A protein has these predicted regions:
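Active-site/ligand-binding neighborhood in enzyme catalytic cores
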Residues: 129-249
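Dinucleotide-binding Rossmann-like beta1-alpha1 core, especially the glycine-rich loop
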Residues: 52-138
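Glycine-rich FAD pyrophosphate-binding loop
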Residues: 24-52
């Protein structure tokens, strides 16, 4: 790259920002990076704001997975490593006609030891026996629907009361329609005949390779928004341009050059990293490749509402010392999960002793976006009264709407993505993807995709 090549990154979530950082930091020669973000702020669905007298309470993701190193490494690179704190270790529950502790020794809901599972109050005697015979069953080969696979291996109760609530709460998903491949921790277990035995070995290996008591999750003390703020500052300090309110409506190609058209200005590029959601990317990619654009347009996204409450200390039941609870789909009305934030995070404890509670409503197949704020609050409080047996009256309320923000990885998602990339590779070389719509939804996965996209882009530019 003898001259300054131009790269446009479309999308200012953590994947787009990390891509921009990596492009500048890793390029062996001058490079001009422009990041275009359609909204008036960067961060995607990572957002942190003051609440109930606390300086920083997250409005979406409140942590990242530490044992998958990519997000932790990024935080350290940005100088935030010392500011990462871990949850308190308070235990979570499942509400199924009452509260039940989530059994120990699970891997995303999959039992790793039969003994702890057998002691759980969450399952009927039949459900326990059905799960216990899993190692004796013949191998299951059709493995690209989480729900179908887990039911075949462990029976209905383990799927409905453990795996679906746990995975569904992360991805806002219906696991009957969600790809096993999209959840690497589970997908790895399908390579062996017994999922239970494989889960046990995976947990033992993870324990062996980590320090005793090492946290599974971490978050900056100033909230996940601190990661975005520091990252965007680093990107601009290194010379990249971040353009807000720059919605891309089309991309055209002339020779080896691309032109990215926004409402306000056109941008020239030698390569493009698409780090925007598939539903936003499909329209502007159709100009480059009709087939790829149509495939992306067919991908679905779920909507979630997160209601944050501050409950006066005098109202909060003293016995509720856990980190929150999940609601299995057959038991759901509107609330899918509730997190008792002040129990989960030591730095989320207001001076007046209030309990910070975050309540999730909506998922794939359960739309709540049409309700107004008052209705949503009433639905949340009514469900919590059923679950907790107490009529809560919050003194602070915040409602965060995340419309079509959770990509739904249907079975065979990665085969369709490969088809998109193969088609684009022929018609639009130098266009690559990164972000939650493509190869993983969690923050570490988005960071990893960004690093990979940067490497691929620099390799492409080196041949021009």
């Amino acid at each position: 790259m003898s001259h300054g090549h131009r790269v446009v990154v479309i999308g200012g979530g953590i994947a787009g920002l990390t891509t921009a950082l990596s492009l500048i930091a890793d390029s062996p020669s001058p490079i001009h990076v422009t990041l275009l973000e359609a909204k008036d702020t960067v961060g995607g669905i990572i957002r942190t704001s003051p609440f109930a007298g606390l300086p920083a309470v997250d409005e979406a993701a409140d942590a990242f997975l530490v044992r998958v190193p990519h997000a932790q490494q990024l935080a350290t690179e940005l100088g935030l490593g010392a500011a990462i704190t871990a949850p308190t270790g308070a235990h979570a529950s499942v509400w199924h006609n009452g509260m039940h502790d989530i059994p120990a020794d699970l891997l995303l809901g999959v039992p790793a030891k039969a003994r702890a599972f057998a002691r759980s109050t969450l399952f009927s005697p039949y459900g326990k026996v059905r799960a216990a015979v899993e190692p004796l069953l013949p191998r299951t080969t059709d493995n690209d629907s989480i729900g179908h696979f887990v039911r075949r291996r462990f029976g209905r109760e383990v799927h409905e009361r453990l795996v679906d609530p746990l995975v569904g709460s992360i991805y806002a998903a219906d696991t009957d329609s969600f790809s096993m491949e999209a959840v690497p921790q589970l997908s790895a277990l399908t390579a062996e005949r017994s999922m239970l035995l494989a889960a046990g070995r995976a947990r033992a290996a993870a324990a062996k390779n980590s320090q005793p008591g090492a946290p599974i999750f971490g978050t900056p003390l100033r909230g996940m928004g601190a990661l975005i703020e520091t990252l965007s500052q680093r990107v601009t300090a290194l010379g990249a341009s971040i353009i807000l309110n720059a919605r891309v409506h089309s991309v055209t190609k002339s020779g080896h050059q691309y032109t990215i058209h926004t409402d306000g200005k056109d941008y020239e590029a030698d390569a493009i990293v698409v780090a925007s959601p598939a539903r936003h990317s499909a329209p502007f990619l159709r100009d480059l490749d009709t087939h790829a654009g149509q495939l992306l347009a067919d991908w679905t996204h779920a909507s979630v509402v997160l209601i944050t409450l501050a409950i006066p200390a005098t109202q909060w039941p003293a016995h509720l010392t856990g980190s929150g609870y999940l609601v299995p789909k057959p038991d759901q009305r509107w609330v899918t999960a509730a997190s008792f934030g002040s129990n989960k995070w030591a730095h989320w404890r207001p001076a007046d002793g209030s309990m910070i509670v975050r309540v999730s409503l909506g998922r794939d197949g359960l739309d709540v976006m049409h309700f107004d704020d008052d209705k949503l609050l009433n639905l949340a409080l009514a469900d919590m009264k059923l679950h907790l047996g107490v009529d809560l009256q919050p003194n602070h309320v915040r409602i965060s709407r995340w419309a079509e923000s959770f990509p739904q990885y249907r079975p065979h998602h990665f085969a369709r993505l490969a088809e998109v990339e193969q088609s684009l590779g022929l018609r639009a070389p130098g266009v690559v993807f990164a972000g939650a719509s493509y190869r993983g939804i969690g923050i570490p996965a988005c960071v990893q995709q960004a690093r990979t996209a940067s490497t691929a882009t620099l390799h492409f530019l080196s041949a021009l």
